[in-house]
Regions:
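Gly/Ala-rich beta-loop-alpha elbow adjacent to hydrolase catalytic centers
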Residues: 98-102, 106
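Short beta-strand/loop motif that positions the catalytic acidic residue
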Residues: 142, 148-150
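Conserved alpha/beta-hydrolase "acid-adjacent" motif
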Residues: 155-160
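Serine-hydrolase catalytic machinery in alpha/beta-hydrolase-like enzymes
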Residues: 2-93, 105
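Catalytic active-site module of serine/aspartate enzymes centered on a nucleophile-bearing elbow/loop
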Residues: 181-212, 216, 228, 232
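Active-site nucleophile loop of the alpha/beta-hydrolase fold
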Residues: 58, 120-128, 151
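Catalytic histidine-centered segment of alpha/beta-hydrolase-like enzymes
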Residues: 173-183
Length: 232
């Protein structure tokens, strides 16, 4: 489906359940698409929970550009996209996320969008080799539950867990999270189940809790109750 925004048209691939418990909206990295293995794993995790899942191609990518340009303009367009998707599913909680640059957008706009939680795959903490240019503030800006899944060898860095931000570090992989589809599906599925239904999954390695992190895929990631050329 096409979605008009002030920045131009976007498109969304929508898997819509009849009576979904939540809406999961996902988007790509700076120069990527919505069919990356990690986004497809997150999509399947949402479908496993009965969600409506939208994978959004942002306006700049639909125009053929590989760099998103102004963050403010990108965020404005994202909020228009999410608002129009939410009108199709009134009263349903929103969980939004993405990979790399898409994860940044999801964090920056979470409050304004009214998101219950954010999924950040391969969050680019800093440009490669430039740790002084940290984007950790964007994670905190979400103001809600955030699940970060990063590769241990990611040249864009690995965020620290803090507050409502959980971080899972997958060994043996970098920014693409290659070969981790199964682990991502399990992690995201357990996280979504607890967020939306309050299911109590088994304890993950390291006893992951709010403001903590764990290395390895683990069986689950429980949040607190109550609630290349990918440019980053």
């Amino acid at each position: 489906m096409k979605i008009r925004t002030a920045a131009g048209p976007a498109s969304a691939e929508l898997d819509a359940a009849a009576d979904p418990p939540f809406l999961l909206v996902l988007t790509h990295g700076a120069g990527g698409g919505t069919d990356s293995a990690d986004l497809m794993a997150a999509r399947q995790a949402g479908l496993d929970q009965g969600a409506a899942v939208a994978r959004v191609v942002q306006p700049y990518r639909l125009r053929g550009a590989r760099a998103p340009g102004s963050a403010a303009r990108q965020d404005e367009a994202w909020l228009e996209i999410v608002a129009k998707l939410r009108r199709r599913f009134p009263g349903v909680p929103l969980i939004q996320g993405g990979r790399s640059n898409g994860a940044r957008v999801a964090c920056r706009t979470a409050r304004a969008a009214g998101a219950l939680a954010v999924l950040a795959l391969a969050f680019p903490l800093h440009p490669p080799g430039r740790p002084e240019r940290s984007r950790a503030a964007e994670l905190a800006q979400a103001g809600t539950e955030v699940l970060v899944v990063n590769g241990a060898a990611d040249p864009f860095g690995v965020p620290e867990a803090a507050g409502a931000i959980r971080v899972v570090v997958l060994p043996g992989t970098a920014h693409a999270l290659a070969g981790q589809g199964g682990a991502i599906r399990r992690l995201v599925g357990s996280w979504l189940a607890l967020l939306v239904r309050g299911d109590d999954p088994p304890e993950p390695p390291g006893g992951l809790r709010p403001g903590s992190s764990v290395t390895g895929p683990g069986p689950s990631v429980p949040p607190s109750r109550g609630v290349g050329r990918d440019l980053g």
